[in-house]
Amino acid sequence: SIDATVGKQIEIYQTILRRTAQPKKKKSGVLICGAYGKGNAGDDAILKAILAQLKAIDRDMPIYVMSHDPAQTRLCYHVGSVHVFDPFAFWPLMRKAKLFVSGGGSLIQNETSTRSLNYYLTTIRMAHAAGCRVMMYGCGIGPVSGEANRRHTARILNRCVDRITLREDLSRRELADMGVTEPKITVTADPALLLQPASGGAVDSYFLSNDLDPDGKYAMFVLRPWKNLSQHLQAIVDTADYVNKTYGLTPVFVALEPTRDLEINRTAASMLTCRTVVLPALRDEQLTIGMMQKMRVIVSMRLHALIFASSVGAPLAAISYDPKVTGFMAY
């Protein structure tokens, strides 16, 4: 309508005037670095929660995200974004930003690779050299293996980081064991716990679009590829078969990171004789959380499926392949 168009234009003009009236500062805004833009629902949920918190503090705050898919990040989150491996793009932003946020997620570990660990440590060191305050936010720490890697990690964090918030106590102990003492360290929680589930109507519509009864009885399984998983897959399938035959629950397999997880979830589903459903991750993390409210039980390897489930009080069981899963369940 005309009134809505006029109202939107007035809002735009007011935003321009408000931002123009702000005093010019030598350094301002936030640059965020994490494993974003890879299609992982857990990492996307972390980013959404961090951005919501920052915008609640100052809706005009300049925010940039280092992403594996900058175009998608700009489109989805309405923030500036540069490629995570383009130092010619992110170094100027480090020089402009007042705060550098490393996290959330398990960035400081070399289970993925020592190259990955060194990359995130290098970005922290660069941000510190550029004059940013450095915060590691909502992080999981470890495992960091190898004495040289542990000493190098402790040296960078002690010299370059101002504040660390952690999602569980196991990470605090890992930092203490490495000798990280200089930053102020607080155990809080994963940022994704702040996300609210989608409305009941939206969740019901999604169920119906996938030929699922919104009032049905379901057990969710969230698997991911991992070394030696094939040796234990039959036990997971037997569990799904048991809850189906004993409690009448339909197994629903969800790929939280579709490009990596879809195949293993399809394989597990194909080993069952009862009806099963295999779903890719939803782009809307809040819809994923809303789905979990309808599950009678959730069995997951993926950490953020466990976090989503706990945020809505859904019964859950973890298949721990990594200390971060064990740490969260203990916390």
PLM regions: where:
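A charged, aromatic-enriched C-terminal amphipathic alpha-helix characteristic of glycosyltransferases
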Residues: S1-T20
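Active-site anion-handling motifs in enzyme catalytic cores
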Residues: R19-Y331
